[in-house]
Amino acid sequence: MIPMVKYKDTINLYDEKGKLVEENVPLEAISPLHNPTIQKLVKDVKRTVAVNLAGIENALRTGQVGGKGCMIKGRELDLPIVENAETIAEYVEKVVRVSEDDDTSIKLINDGKQMAVQIPSKRLDVAAEYSVSVLVTAQALKEAIIRTFDVDIFDAPMVHAAVLGGYPHEVTMKGSNIAALLGSPLSLEGPGYALRNIMANHFVACTKKNVMNAVAFAAIMEQTAMFEMGDAVGLFERLHLLGLAYQGLNADNLVIDLVKANGKNGTVGTVVASVVERALEDGVIKEDKTLPSGFKLYKPVDVAKWNAYAAAGLVAAAIVNCGAARAAQNIASTILYYNDILEYETGLPGVDFGRAEGTAVGFSFFSHSIYGGGGPGIFNGNHIVTRHSKGFAIPPVAAAMCLDAGTQMFSPERTSALVGTVFSAIDEFREPLKYVIKGALEVKDKI
């Protein structure tokens, strides 16, 4: 039983195709503090590791370990790792498991070419952070390969390099054949950023380019991180819950309604007009005053809900604009000018009170311009360029990358192939919207 209800808000929940699932669900049923699916998702993100057994076999056969351009001639090992995937998986499970009834899970995928490892929660409980998942799995995997193929002490370092790449001298594990959704803790921008350390392409790959699920996954991780960072606390908790509900989970079918209204002939500007109309209809904003020119200014009736509506509109604008182009490159300018137009049109603050718009200025430069260091898909909420918005800027990027028709050099297929193959085989990673709604229905009557 949840001891107290803080907010009177209720939402209607829809699936990824815009079909009503449940009406009048308490807002707190989708809170990371109460929703069992979100809690499981966060836990599984931390304890799940993707292993590329075919990649390890190829690295050892060619001597190409430690990243691009690193090849050690004369140190090749021809080991039939994929052929013996079941033996290796059994050994890894034996080493990783703590007790017979714990939640350890080892799953071979794609005829043994890849493997999903979920370490037991007990190992996570006695760790300070999530590195334990990769490091324990890697150690068990190295031992399994060494024991299975009787690798001697002189060749064992090659097994290490094939599994962990350049680690430990390269802390990002460049060239490794093991991966987690969360990036290295050593790359965190500051305290509390860990759950935001997932590139947009990973969300796209995990959900197999399903727009609504990718947006949901991104929003869940970004907004759950706000609880860790201390942003979604006190007066600001409701703002973040509404943002998660409307932008991430398509509450009241707002995102899909806006896309339907503008999908055929719409632009970013017409999406803005639709958001304003819907907000007026729903009593979220109201007319404030009319200037001598006839221009109308608005004021919020509920500022947190206005932000949620604006954030949902931002995702809709991304879907309409990037979807029309079949390309993701314009997502930075879409985030920027959606907010710019919205502010000029209404006199109200843009998404996240200007932080999404400000993020988009730097995002435009660093994904285009004279720098152009990476496409939109490689950015995340922990990136120095895109960290500034409090959870509202990454979901539209995930939407845009789902709609890209192969125009990106940094495509999900290039950056997230292993992650996508392994994590998409796990239901709640592939269809987070469905399972978060299921979790909300489990707890709604207890609130």
From Swiss-Prot:
UniProt record, GO biological process: methanogenesis
Keywords annotated in UniProt: Cytoplasm, Methanogenesis, Transferase
Any one GO molecular-function label of the UniProt entry: coenzyme-B sulfoethylthiotransferase activity
Primary localization class, coarse: cytoplasm
Pathway(s) the chain acts in: One-carbon metabolism; methyl-coenzyme M reduction; methane from methyl-coenzyme M: step 1/1
Entry cofactors: coenzyme F430
Location(s), subcellular: Cytoplasm
Pfam families: MCR_beta (PF02241), MCR_beta_N (PF02783)
EC number assigned by the record: 2.8.4.1
GO cellular component, one term: cytoplasm
Residues noted as binding coenzyme M in the record, renumbered to the chain: 371
Catalytic activity from the UniProt record: coenzyme B + methyl-coenzyme M = methane + coenzyme M-coenzyme B heterodisulfide
Organism domain of life: Archaea
InterPro entries cross-referenced by the UniProt entry: Me_CoM_Rdtase_asu/bsu_C, Me_CoM_Rdtase_asu_N_sub2, Me_CoM_Rdtase_bsu, Me_CoM_Rdtase_bsu_C, Me_CoM_Rdtase_bsu_N, Me_CoM_Rdtase_Fd-like_fold
Binding positions for coenzyme B per the UniProt entry: 373
Cofactor note: Binds 2 coenzyme F430 non-covalently per MCR complex. Coenzyme F430 is a yellow nickel porphinoid. Methyl-coenzyme-M reductase is activated when the enzyme-bound coenzyme F430 is reduced to the Ni(I) oxidation state.
Broadest EC class assigned to this enzyme: transferase
Reported function: Component of the methyl-coenzyme M reductase (MCR) I that catalyzes the reductive cleavage of methyl-coenzyme M (CoM-S-CH3 or 2-(methylthio)ethanesulfonate) using coenzyme B (CoB or 7-mercaptoheptanoylthreonine phosphate) as reductant which results in the production of methane and the mixed heterodisulfide of CoB and CoM (CoM-S-S-CoB). This is the final step in methanogenesis.
Family listed: Belongs to the methyl-coenzyme M reductase beta subunit family.
NCBIfam families referenced in this protein's UniProt entry, alphabetically: met_CoM_red_bet
Quaternary data: MCR is a hexamer of two alpha, two beta, and two gamma chains, forming a dimer of heterotrimers.
Protein name from the UniProt record: Methyl-coenzyme M reductase I subunit beta
Organism: Methanocaldococcus jannaschii (strain ATCC 43067 / DSM 2661 / JAL-1 / JCM 10045 / NBRC 100440) (Methanococcus jannaschii)
Gene name of this polypeptide: mcrB
